[in-house]
């Protein structure tokens, strides 16, 4: 049976065990106490007899209470059960009647003067108590040794059971332990003890089943996917197979596995390694505050450096070519603009020259025409005057002129 702790106000624990059967024969004192119906004898009897009251097997008592006399009550009161259920019911009636009428005043009933002289060594003089308290494992004997070291009588008196105590008001059947003589039932109880602990840790049954299913699946997967160490030679073969298939993006685990043809290598190994190879190849640069890089093997480190260096060089060359191309285009555009500007300047200069030459020619032609017209007019006038004179001279010659008289001065 499971032990039930009963907590009192004095922080004393009450435990019950079913593994210690009582085989002690009842003493004459215990028989006399069990047969008596006088309730006042509970306080008038010595404490040793009261102790045997609880430890007697003749009346079917709960068992013996392992307590001390010189140092007060023990902190742990152990109850051992009996086999017969009828004896338990018989003692329950007698003990409940006797326990109800205990005095409520602890100070007056349990003073230092009223204690009997043989109370201090009752566990040594009474052989029944010694036989009941000595157990095979020696646990209770050690408790007696610890109890003898204490001498606080007031604390011992405060922990006596009175009628005002809530423990007395409860039913004694709760304090009695029901045991069965069948060994199969005991085995079942011992097997069922750790079940409450499992329920406390994992309340739901579905949660309890999950670890079992996961472990079975993990074991199955472990048999199919065993861990494998990738050596540099295996990695080189893997890289060659990936390159032969057209790169890491086009390569498939099945194709790589066929090309490698390594004994013990499965598709799961190739798949995981291919995924790691892809992530290592296209891994972004770590930030300043980011996590440190994963340690790579020398071969992977070299390949990653080569890839990074090649990518950097090609990117730089591509950018340089683009810049040079843009510069050439800009120079060509500037050259064309300069040529057009020069042509336009030449054309304008020619237009200005033509305009100037046309103005000069126009003025010269007008002046020449005027001079020519004047000369022609003069010539025509001269030509007209000359014939008139000639004709007059001719007429004068032809006609006779009269003789003029000479005048004498």
From Swiss-Prot:
SUPFAM superfamilies: Homeodomain-like. Residues 222-282 form the HTH myb-type domain. Residues 314-334 form a coiled coil. A motif (LHEQLE) lies at residues 327-332. Residues 192-224 have a biased composition (Low complexity). It is found in: Nucleus. Homodimers and heterodimers. Interacts with SPX1 in a Pi-dependent manner. Does not interact with PHL2 or PHL3. Residues 1-42, 86-108, 178-226, 358-409 are annotated as: Disordered. The keyword GTP-binding does not apply. The gene is PHR1. Keywords: Coiled coil, DNA-binding, Nucleus, Phosphoprotein, Transcription, Transcription regulation, Ubl conjugation. Residues 253-278 bind DNA. Transcription factor involved in phosphate starvation signaling. Binds as a dimer to P1BS, an imperfect palindromic sequence 5'-GNATATNC-3', to promote the expression of inorganic phosphate (Pi) starvation-responsive genes. SPX1 is a competitive inhibitor of this DNA-binding. PHR1 binding to its targets is low Pi-dependent. Regulates the expression of miR399. Regulates the expression of IPS1 (At3g09922), a non-coding RNA that mimics the target of miR399 to block the cleavage of PHO2 under Pi-deficient conditions. One of its GO terms (cellular component) is nucleus. This is Protein PHOSPHATE STARVATION RESPONSE 1. The keyword Ubl conjugation applies. Belongs to the MYB-CC family. PANTHER family: HTH MYB-TYPE DOMAIN-CONTAINING PROTEIN, MYB FAMILY TRANSCRIPTION FACTOR PHL11. Residues 1-15, 371-396 have a biased composition (Basic and acidic residues). One of its GO terms (biological process) is regulation of monoatomic ion transmembrane transport. It comes from Arabidopsis thaliana (Mouse-ear cress). Its main location: nucleus. Residues 16-26, 90-108, 358-370 have a biased composition (Polar residues). GO terms for molecular function: DNA binding; DNA-binding transcription factor activity. InterPro entries: Homeodomain-like_sf, Myb_CC_LHEQLE, Myb_dom, Myb_dom_plants, PHR1-like, SANT/Myb. Sumoylated by SIZ1. Sumoylation controls phosphate deficiency responses. The modification Phosphoserine is found at residue 399. Disruption phenotype: Strongly reduced shoot growth, and slightly increased root growth. Reduced expression of phosphate starvation-induced (PSI) genes, decreased cellular inorganic phosphate (Pi) content and shoot-to-root ratio, and impaired anthocyanin accumulation.
């Amino acid at each position: 049976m499971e032990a039930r702790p009963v907590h009192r106000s004095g922080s004393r624990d009450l435990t019950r065990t079913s593994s210690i059967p009582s085989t002690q024969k009842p003493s004459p004192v215990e028989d006399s106490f069990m047969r008596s119906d006088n309730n006042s004898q509970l306080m008038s009897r010595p404490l040793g007899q009261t102790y045997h009251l609880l430890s007697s097997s003749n009346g079917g008592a709960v068992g013996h209470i392992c307590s001390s006399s010189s140092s007060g009550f023990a902190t742990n009161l152990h109850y051992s059960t009996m086999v017969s259920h009828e004896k338990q019911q018989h003692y329950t009636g007698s003990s409940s009647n006797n326990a109800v009428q205990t005095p409520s005043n602890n100070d007056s009933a349990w003073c230092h003067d009223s204690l009997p002289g043989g109370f201090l060594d009752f566990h040594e003089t009474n052989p029944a108590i010694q036989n009941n308290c000595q157990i095979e494992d020696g646990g209770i004997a050690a408790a007696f040794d610890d109890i003898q070291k204490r001498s606080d009588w007031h604390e011992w008196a405060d922990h006596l059971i009175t009628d005002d105590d809530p423990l007395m008001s409860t039913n004694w059947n709760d304090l009695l332990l029901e045991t069965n003589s069948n060994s199969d039932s005991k085995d079942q109880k011992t097997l069922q003890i750790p079940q409450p602990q499992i329920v406390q840790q994992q309340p739901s049954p579905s949660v309890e089943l999950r670890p079992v299913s996961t472990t079975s699946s993990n074991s199955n997967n472990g048999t199919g996917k065993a861990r494998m160490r990738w050596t540099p030679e295996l990695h080189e073969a893997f890289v060659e197979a990936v390159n032969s298939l057209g790169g890491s993006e086009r390569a498939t685990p099945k194709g790589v596995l066929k090309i490698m043809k390594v004994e013990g290598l499965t598709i799961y190994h190739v798949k995981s390694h291919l995924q790691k190879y892809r992530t290592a190849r296209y891994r972004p640069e770590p930030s300043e505050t980011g996590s440190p890089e994963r340690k790579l093997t020398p071969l992977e480190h070299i390949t990653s450096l080569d890839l990074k260096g090649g990518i950097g060089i090609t990117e730089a060359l591509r950018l340089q070519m683009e810049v040079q191309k843009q510069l050439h285009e800009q120079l060509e555009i500037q050259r064309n603009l300069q040529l057009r500007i020069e042509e336009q300047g030449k054309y304008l200069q020619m237009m200005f020259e033509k305009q100037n030459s046309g103005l000069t020619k126009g003025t010269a032609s007008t002046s020449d025409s005027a001079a020519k017209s004047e000369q022609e007019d003069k010539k025509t006038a001269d030509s007209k005057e000359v014939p008139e004179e000639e004709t007059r001279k001719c007429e004068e010659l032809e006609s006779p002129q009269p003789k003029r008289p000479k005048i004498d001065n």
